[in-house]
């Protein structure tokens, strides 16, 4: 059956996440009434979320202490500020929102009773033979940030991509469950519809968003992880390909930036060309 987020985080009771399932969160289809806008200085993201994340500058925000503001850390923002969209039931429409990643990180940390950075270190990073330490940003309350907080070298990101390509196995060792890594490319009509209902993505190459991955083709099992500045882990299982690139697009708009499709199409063409050699 479906698992509600409130079963993982009791603190989410009464919040916008009270009505959603974990799958809704992983598919960014949680029906939130919160628009993610990185550049509008009057947006809720700019005024409340970014300062709580410690990833945005607002005069005086870094000096605030607990009790001086209702929204001190990210968890406060998730439980006290984000509201449900009454016109968008959970599961209906894809709408990328960083709050989903943060509530997912919160759930994983609660379920495993460990900090997110320790979980990543013990369950993933040490098992993929990473060449370098990664680091994760913390919010204003010194809690690890799941959205946009993780930093690694390109080579280590490629190692992670290779493990995902091989359905959770790296150099013969099981790192992540195969079921999840197979499920994300099991695209159904409802998943396609959720993407198509968002006018921002209806003309893009993505066919769906599932389990925190952007899906390009469920037959060839081609998909990506994408950051807001255009940084990408590109995976194509049919061509046995993993590509990683960093980026600094002019606008923080992830896949909606005009220069993004050019880079993605080049990667797709290169993967197909190399597979034919």
Named regions from a protein language model:
Residues 1-4, 8-9:
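Single conserved hydrophobic/aromatic residue that forms the stacking wall/gate
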Residues 32-33, 101, 142-144, 164, ...:
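Solvent-exposed loop/turn segments at secondary-structure junctions
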Residues 47, 138-152, 199, 203, ...:
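Carbohydrate-binding/catalytic loop surfaces
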Residues 131-135, 185-242:
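Active-site Gly/Thr loop motif
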Residues 222-277:
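Structured C-terminal helix/loop/strand segments within mature extracytoplasmic catalytic/sensor domains
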């Amino acid at each position: 059956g479906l698992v509600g987020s409130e079963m993982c985080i009791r603190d989410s009771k009464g919040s916008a996440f009270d009505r959603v399932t974990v799958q809704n969160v992983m598919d960014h289809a949680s029906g939130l009434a919160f628009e993610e806008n990185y550049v509008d200085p009057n947006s809720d993201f700019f005024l409340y979320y970014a300062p709580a994340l410690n990833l945005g500058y607002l005069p005086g925000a870094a000096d605030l202490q607990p009790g001086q503001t209702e929204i001190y850390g990210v968890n406060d923002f998730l439980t006290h500020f984000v509201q449900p969209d009454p016109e968008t039931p959970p599961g209906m429409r894809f709408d990328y929102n960083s709050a989903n990643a943060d509530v997912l990180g919160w759930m994983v940390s609660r379920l495993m009773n460990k900090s997110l950075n320790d979980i990543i270190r013990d369950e993933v990073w040490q098992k993929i033979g990473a060449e370098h330490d990664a680091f994760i940003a913390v919010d204003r309350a010194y809690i690890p940030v799941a959205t946009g907080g993780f930093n690694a070298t390109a080579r280590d990101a490629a190692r992670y991509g290779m493990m995902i390509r091989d359905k959770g196995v790296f150099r013969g060792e099981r790192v992540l469950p195969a079921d999840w890594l197979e499920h994300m490319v099991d695209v159904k009509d409802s998943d396609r519809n959720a993407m198509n209902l968002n006018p921002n993505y209806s003309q893009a190459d993505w066919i769906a968003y599932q389990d925190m991955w952007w899906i390009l083709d469920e037959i060839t099992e081609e998909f990506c992880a994408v950051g807001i500045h255009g940084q990408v882990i590109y995976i194509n299982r049919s061509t046995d390909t993993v590509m990683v690139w960093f980026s600094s697009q002019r606008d923080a708009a992830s896949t909606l930036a005009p220069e993004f499709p050019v880079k993605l199409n080049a990667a797709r063409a290169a993967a197909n060309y190399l597979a034919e050699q």
